[in-house]
Amino acid sequence: MSQFVDRVVLHLKAGDGGNGCNSVRREKFMPLGGPDGGNGGHGGDIVLEVDPQVHTLLDFRFSPHVRAERGNNGAGDDRHGARGKDLTLHVPPGTVVIDEDGEVLADLVSPGQKVIVAQGGFGGLGNASLASKTRKAPGFALLGEPGEQKDVTLELKSMADVGLVGFPSAGKSSLISVLSAAKPKIADYPFTTLAPNLGVVSVDHDTFTIADVPGLIPGASEGRGLGLDFLRHIERTAVLAHVVDAAALESERNPLDDIRALEHELDSYQSELSADAGLGDLRERPRVIILNKMDVPDAEDMADLQEEELKKFGWPIFRISTVARTGLNELRFALMDIVREHRKKVENTPEPQQVIRPQSVGPKRKGRFADFEVHEDKQNPGAFIVTGQKIDRWILQTDFENDEAIGFLADRLAKAGVEEALWQAGAVDGSEVTIGGITFEWDPQTVAGVDQTPAYGRGKDRRLEQTDRVTAEQRKRASQARRGLIDEYDYGDGEVAHTERWQG
């Protein structure tokens, strides 16, 4: 029998984006071919997908470190890098994804349902993509963005219709073994069941699933016994069944006290839940009472004495014996009726319309109103920290060994309004400024509030502005001179050139 694992911690690392290429076209008869560096490919995502053939999280316990493929680098001749392959992890239905802060990222219940838990980094732009009318031959490219790295917790909550709860040795495992084909471990000592058991019960060409969780004892909410950890497997159930040992020999125990103690523990568990499982409060779930071991002497007498008090709960009461196999059919049909009623309610309840609005990566407004914040570093007076998703990405994608790339970054920050915001925050020339984890000594390019455009933008190739190549006009005059149509004279510096028509 495979080991049942219902909670694991995964260490995820999505693929890094590939670097852009810094290349110039070199081809015969193509002078000044221009930049032709391709873009890097995006890194691969890490995706969780529900697979109904998977029933446990066991595989992840031995392989908790997960890494997706990085994107390939760009190349010359405008060749873009390939995107890294997405890594898909198959999880069982009922898997809940929780981040490091305890927030639920996704609740995966439907077969084929997918969620991206770690996003790959964007590929860097090649110098061909960075070229513009004012930056015709960039001598740099952008680096790939690192992929998302995080730790997530996967919790499995069984998708059972009926949940069996009760004290240890109440006969829960025996009941699931006689109602279904499941073969759980059964022994005559407490806490025989250390992991949930699932079984499928057939009734009139219909089926429902039943879950047996480890036994509860008073004080379980405080950590006694196995605690309340396994109760997550009954959060999604349509009905809770109290399995009570009607033949308990302990003088301080009886069916009525057992049920009250169990309800107290369930109430404590529900109070600790941050959100329900979509079926409402666990305390309001339908319940039935199952008095087990009615084949034992004095069990009938004990049940008769407690029946009037048990009826005050207002729940159906069933007397069964898993050994003699009595009362099982009545119980089976009653549970099936409750499950069917629940399924009708779920089918008739329209699902809320979910409107997905993608989160914008860039600023809501362009220019100096980019989405970033500037605040003073409390640990270093006089220093400042700039935070913003897009600003941080610019830092990560800058090659700080390339002066032209650094200048391009400075231009972008100035156009985004970072310099003006730093002035307003009180920064002066030489102040330490931290952006994206990298600290600079601030050297402002422009005076605050003044729009200054440099004569030559960074990344602009001056060779394209100044050339010694002969112009078409000069070639025409030289041709006329060779044919004797005109006579050309060259004078020294400072004198005006003069052309006299040749008289022959």
UniProtKB/Swiss-Prot annotation:
The record places domain OCT at 364-444
Q: Name one GO cellular component term.
A: cytoplasm
Question: EC number(s) on record?
Answer: 3.6.5.-
Q: Which residues form the Obg domain?
A: 2-159
Q: Which UniProt keywords apply?
A: Cytoplasm, GTP-binding, Hydrolase, Magnesium, Metal-binding, Nucleotide-binding
Q: Where is the OBG-type G domain?
A: 160-340
Per UniProt, GTP binds at 166-173, 191-195, 212-215, 292-295, 321-323
Compositionally biased tracts (Basic and acidic residues): 458-476
Q: What is its main location?
A: cytoplasm
Molecular function terms, GO-annotated:
GTP binding; GTPase activity; magnesium ion binding
Q: Which CDD domains match?
A: Obg
**Which Pfam families does this one have?**
DUF1967 (PF09269), GTP1_OBG (PF01018), MMR_HSR1 (PF01926)
The main enzyme category here is hydrolase
Q: Where is this region: Disordered?
A: 68-88, 449-481
Q: Which domain of life is it from?
A: Bacteria
Binding sites annotated in the UniProt record for Mg(2+): S173, T193
Q: Where in the cell is it found?
A: Cytoplasm
Cofactor or coenzyme needed: Mg(2+)
Q: Which GO BP annotation is one of this protein's?
A: ribosome biogenesis
Q: What does this protein do?
A: An essential GTPase which binds GTP, GDP and possibly (p)ppGpp with moderate affinity, with high nucleotide exchange rates and a fairly low GTP hydrolysis rate. Plays a role in control of the cell cycle, stress response, ribosome biogenesis and in those bacteria that undergo differentiation, in morphogenesis control.
**Quaternary structure per UniProt?**
Monomer.
Family, as annotated: Belongs to the TRAFAC class OBG-HflX-like GTPase superfamily. OBG GTPase family.
Tell me the protein's name. GTPase Obg
Protein source organism: Corynebacterium urealyticum (strain ATCC 43042 / DSM 7109)
